[in-house]
Amino acid sequence: MSTWNPENDVDLLSGSEDEEDVSMKRDYHGREAILFVVDANLQTAGVERLLEALNIIRTAFISGLLVNDKDLIGLIFANTKHSPPPLEASALDNIVMPDNCAVFLPLRQLTKPIVEHYLEFMGGVETQFADVYGLAEPDGRGRFDLMIRLCIEMLEKCGKKLNNAKIAYVTDVREPHPSNSNHFQAALQKASDLEGKEFEFHVIPMVDDFDYEPFYKEFITLSRAIELDAFQVPDAQMLREILSDRKLKQDFLRRCLGHFSFYLGPNLSMSVQYYNYFQRRAYPRKVQILRRDNSVVRTKRVITVQKQKDDGSQDIEHEYQIKVTGGWYTCNVGERDLRISMDQLNRVRNLHKPQMMLLGFKHRSSLPEVSYIKPANFMYPDDQSIIGSKRLFRALWERCLVRDKIAICLFMCKRKSIPRYVALVPVEAPDNGEDKNYRSLLCGDGFKIVYLPEAKHIRHLDLQDWNNTENTADEQKVEFFQKIIKKLRVDYQPNLINDPSLDALQANLLALSLDFSTDTKGLDNLLDTSQQDKRIEKLLPDYEMFAPEAEPHKKRAAKSTTAGASGPKMAKIDDDQLKEFEFVKSLNKDEALTSCTAAQLHFILQHHFDVTMPKSSKKAKLVAKIEELHK
């Protein structure tokens, strides 16, 4: 995060610039645009390298169509011999086309026909690219400065308001012109035009051992207005992955969650902004389609106001429509109706602006490594609202790093939200040699906002009058509540692991709309296991190994009499015993009459009750008759 280093900052307090212009807030409205420029020299090393570059752009097209179809994307081929017009030739009416450049796709929103057109082009690119576009003669080098001018003109005349425009130049040539030529100096002068227009220029090398020294190191530093020594050679493979995912290193604007003021003390504050570490993978919006033509049903919320007649009837005297913001709430107070408009309601809800207040500092060891509440956010300064915020922020960050301290703050992240206790943990940008995952580039020097699950970290601070100390809990209650917090479960949504359900949904959408199948890897792209092992090693000492539990011997269960199973064996009943009435009564009491034979049951009925039953009577009927006579 070198952008808020005081050594690289412009002295805003010197009065060299208009203070009103500096303090004016940046306009965050607009669209993102990315213009792909593919060097035709890629075909000289074999058509496989050109296909690899086009496949990267194909992945970016598909991801843009599925995730955010409002971004503008264009495609230009540079250093070509021929300049065939694009499919929409009228889009270049107001643009001056230089030689050795061909516009395949002007800056447009991604739609299904555009992606289908690109896929059809890729189907025959192996045999048709050399004939349709060719390579610039005699040495395959066109005018680099004219190509940059074409890109700037296309971005300016795209017809949309842009807030983040990028030019991605895909090549394997280390310099567009010889260093002793006039075209080389003219190309370097175009870097100042990019810096003035605030357009980002990125080189995407198609070879891993790409050399930036001859030309692109100086060109990129001039376009970004940084020192030549501050340039760091990026990883070529990492840049190709970034391009396919369309998450470039400088894209902090899309991930910004809000801007707020950080109050350090009386009459001392600075403006900051906070972000998510990673974007959530948004599912496509649910829509309703018509059965006849699969067109999307578009609905619009409308509020209709009806006024009835005063005579008490249900007849409507007047009816009109209002906007959603023009509605109101009505409550009956006494005999009068009190009307509260939405504007008045929002003013009551928005009494407090998002802000953060510093409470104190604690040692870093007092913060547990794992917090069972919610994912952390990332914070760094914003010099647009309060001048000098970057300098003050860096001073606080450096002091916390040196003293190994964390800042305990009260944070209200957005309007109408509940203030939360948070800890600001200073973090440093990882070295390129330590982590080769390109997602680490999204995080730099700054503070990590860790949400605290309980208030134990602010227990021994001076809370003054605004927080009553009588509400504090003793240590036993805090430990008990910590155990409760650890039992809570939250949805684990790591964006570094592919969501199999989302991949399946996207594959089905692509198969339905573009009629081609995709390889869904599912959970194959897991995190680096070595990084996981390092984190697990820190947690292993907290676990205890118990002795193996002895499994008790299983007892043989008795057989059940249900489901046709045989019951326990009983002694045979002698006929002499049946002559005794007391013995028969005991059999009936123990419900053991079923153990007698049918002949014995007939003998009991005839001998003791003088009842004769038919010989064909079933055993159950005989038992029921004996039980009835006993009653």
UniProtKB/Swiss-Prot annotation:
Q: Which GO terms describe its cellular component?
A: chromosome; Ku70:Ku80 complex
Per the record, the similarity remark reads:
Belongs to the ku70 family.
A Pfam family matched by this chain, by name? Ku_N
Reaction it catalyzes: ATP + H2O = ADP + phosphate + H(+)
The main location is nucleus
Region described as Disordered: 550-570
Record function comment: Single-stranded DNA-dependent ATP-dependent helicase. Involved in non-homologous end joining (NHEJ) DNA double strand break repair. Sequence-specific DNA-binding protein that has a high affinity for a 31 bp sequence in the Yp1 gene. Site-specific DNA binding to 31 bp P element inverted repeats.
Question: Gene name, please?
Answer: Irbp
Q: Which cysteines are joined by disulfide bonds?
A: none
According to the UniProt entry, what is the EC number of this protein?
3.6.4.12
What subunit structure does UniProt give?
A: Heterodimer of a 70 kDa and a 80 kDa subunit.
* A biological process from GO: telomere maintenance
Q: What is this protein called?
A: ATP-dependent DNA helicase 2 subunit 1
Ku domain location, by residue? 262-487
Tell me the organism: Drosophila melanogaster
Q: Which InterPro entries match?
A: Ku70, Ku70/Ku80_beta-barrel_dom, Ku70_bridge/pillars_dom_sf, KU70_core_dom, Ku_C, Ku_N, SPOC-like_C_dom_sf, vWFA_dom_sf
Under Gene Ontology molecular function, one entry of this record is:
ATP binding
Q: Which keywords belong to this entry?
A: ATP-binding, Chromosome, DNA damage, DNA recombination, DNA repair, DNA-binding, Helicase, Hydrolase, Nucleotide-binding, Nucleus
Where is this chain's protein located in or outside the cell? Nucleus; Chromosome
- The answer to whether keyword Heme applies is no
Q: What top-level branch of life does the organism fall under?
A: Eukaryota
- Which residues are in coiled coils? none
Q: Does the keyword Nucleus apply?
A: yes
